[in-house]
């Protein structure tokens, strides 16, 4: 996003299948550099509704996990305004776990698109752009230092260009 008022978002889902086990996982978090309380409320309400349709305990459990997972200890703050994170999801009901993971994916547009549309044409200034570049630096710090997937992929021979493609093209500290 070029406009500093339009938030960045991260979302992924995954399924692992080995000869002896399977599980699902995913992460979905909002990373605005200029926070709007109404945007944060909409984002979390949309996620909560999607989670509750599958298990009323999912949203509080996975939100708490996201709050912990996306926290940057050396900064004493989260990289954004939260979301959900889950891993090792295997309730014993593959169909139900797959349905939940698909629902997380289908929640992306209703959770994020209204926020992007509301802010993408908003006026911004050099201070706003500076805030965006600093926040992008925060996002890069998190991904390079703490993200499990990034660390795993870089240490197991994956293509660094593919692994690092989610990093912002410009950042500032």
Q: What residue ranges belong to the model's regions?
A:
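Internal mixed beta-strand/loop scaffold within catalytic domains of large alpha/beta enzymes
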Residues: 1-24
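Short loop/turn segments at secondary-structure transitions that flank enzyme active sites
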Residues: 5, 17-19, 34-36, 90-92, ...
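Long, contiguous binding/interaction regions
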Residues: 5-7, 110, 114, 150-173
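Aromatic/basic-lined ligand-recognition segments
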Residues: 13, 25, 66-92, 137-139, ...
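Mature, function-bearing regions of proteins
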Residues: 20, 31-37, 82-85, 90, ...
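Compact, glycine/acidic-enriched structural inserts
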Residues: 20-65
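A structural signal for the principal folded core domain
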Residues: 66-84, 97-105, 121, 161, ...
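Extended, compositionally biased non-globular segments
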Residues: 93-146, 151
């Amino acid at each position: 996003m070029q406009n500093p008022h339009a938030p960045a978002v991260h979302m992924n889902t995954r399924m692992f299948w080995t000869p002896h086990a399977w599980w699902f996982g995913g992460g979905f978090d909002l990373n605005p550099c200029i926070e709007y309380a109404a945007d944060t409320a909409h984002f979390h309400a949309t996620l909560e509704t999607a989670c509750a349709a599958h298990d009323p305990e999912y949203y509080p459990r996975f939100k708490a996990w996201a709050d912990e997972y996306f926290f940057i200890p050396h900064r004493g703050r989260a990289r954004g305004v939260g979301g959900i994170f889950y891993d090792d999801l295997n309730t014993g009901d593959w169909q139900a776990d797959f349905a939940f993971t698909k629902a997380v994916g289908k929640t992306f547009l209703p959770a994020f698109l209204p926020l992007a549309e509301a802010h993408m044409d908003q006026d911004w200034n050099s201070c706003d752009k500076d805030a965006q570049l600093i926040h992008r630096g925060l996002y890069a710090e998190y991904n390079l230092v703490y993200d499990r997937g990034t660390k795993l992929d870089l240490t197991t021979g994956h293509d660094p260009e593919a692994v690092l493609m989610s990093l912002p093209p410009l950042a500032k500290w």
